[in-house]
Amino acid sequence: MLQHILLYLINPLAYIVPILLATAFLTLVERKILGYMQFRKGPNIVGPYGLLQPIADGVKLFIKEPVRPSTSSPFLFLATPTLALTLALLMWMPLPLPHAIINLNLGLLFILAVSSLTVYTILGSGWASNSKYALMGALRAVAQTISYEVSLGLILLSMIIFTGGFTLHTFNLTQETVWLLVPGWPLAMMWYISTLAETNRAPFDLTEGESELVSGFNVEYAGGSFALFFLAEYTNILMMNTLSVILFMGSSYDPTMPQISTFYLMMKATLLTLIFLWIRASYPRFRYDQLMHLVWKNFLPLTLALILWHAALPIATASLPPLT
C-alpha cells in the first residue's frame, strides 16, 4: 500500500518539479538572449548575474491580489489557467526520457489529443474575461492552433509510416542507425515551423499582438492566474521541442547509463529551444492572412504529397516497415 502511495505521489512530483524549474529558468534565458541581441544586459540585479530573477518574479506574481473584472465569469475565469498548466504537464507523461511515466501504445495520439484540448483553455479565458480584446485574441488563437494541428497531424502520419508504430519508444529504436532528420528533413522543417505556430511563439504570436490587441487572450489576467498561463506556455515550448528531438533526432539509449541518454536528449531540446528564442529576436510578426496562407496553401499540399510518397515508396520497393 505504502509502495503504491509513494509510486503515485513521488513519480508525478519527480517529473513536475524539474519541468517547472526548467520553465522558470527558460524565462530568464529568454530575457538574457533578447537582451544580448539588443545590445543590453537583461536581468542582472536579483542574485549573481540575475539568476534569482525567475524566483523573484514567481513570488511577486503569486503574492499579488487576484484581480478579476466584475463582469467576468467567475468559475471559468479561474479554471482556465489551472486547466492550461494541467494539460501542459499532462503531455509530458508519454515522453520517453528515456523511460515514460506512462508507456502508452498510442503515445503520439495522446499528445495530439491533449494539445487539441489546450484550445479550450485559450477560448475559455478569452470568453470569460468579457473583454473584446481578449475575445479577439482567443478567436485568433483558436483558428491558428486548429489550422497548424492539421499540418502537425499529417507530418506525424508520415513519421509513423517511417517507424511503423505510434509508440514513442519505437522512434528511439528506429533511429539507432540514422536520425529521421536525414530522410525526413522537409518534414522536420515544416514540423518545427508548425510547433512555433502551435505554441503561439514569434513570429506567429498574433494572439498577443501588443500593437493591436493589448496582450491578447490573457489581457485581464494578473497575479497568480497570469503566472499559470505563463508557465503553461513555456512548458508547452519545452514539451514540443523535446517531442521534436524524440521524433527527428532520436536519443541514443544506453541501458547501463540511462542518465546519459536523458542528458543528450535535454541538450538537443535546449538547443532547439534556443533557436525558438533566436527566431523571436530576429523576425517580425506575420500578418494574419500570411499565417493562414502558409499552412493551408503551402504546408498542407506538401505534407499530403509527402504522405503519399512515404506510403507508396516502401510498397513499390516491397520493403514494408516493421508494423509492430
From Swiss-Prot:
The Gene Ontology terms for molecular function here are: NADH dehydrogenase (ubiquinone) activity
* Membrane topology note: Multi-pass membrane protein
| Gene Ontology biological process terms in this record | aerobic respiration
The record's listing under InterPro entries reads: NADH_UbQ_OxRdtase_su1/FPO, NADH_UbQ_OxRdtase_su1_CS
Q: Where in the cell is it found?
A: Mitochondrion inner membrane
Enzyme group, top EC level? translocase
Q: What is its EC number?
A: 7.1.1.2
Question: Its GO CC terms?
Answer: mitochondrial inner membrane
UniProt keyword terms in alphabetical order: Electron transport, Membrane, Mitochondrion, Mitochondrion inner membrane, NAD, Respiratory chain, Translocase, Transmembrane, Transmembrane helix, Transport, Ubiquinone
Lineage, top-rank taxon, reads Eukaryota
Residues spanning the membrane? 5-25, 75-95, 106-126, 146-166, 177-197, 228-248, 259-279, 299-319
Q: Reaction catalysed by this chain?
A: a ubiquinone + NADH + 5 H(+)(in) = a ubiquinol + NAD(+) + 4 H(+)(out)
Q: What does this protein do?
A: Core subunit of the mitochondrial membrane respiratory chain NADH dehydrogenase (Complex I) that is believed to belong to the minimal assembly required for catalysis. Complex I functions in the transfer of electrons from NADH to the respiratory chain. The immediate electron acceptor for the enzyme is believed to be ubiquinone.
Q: What's the family? A: Belongs to the complex I subunit 1 family.
The entry's protein name is NADH-ubiquinone oxidoreductase chain 1
Look up and give the organism this protein is from.
Squalus acanthias
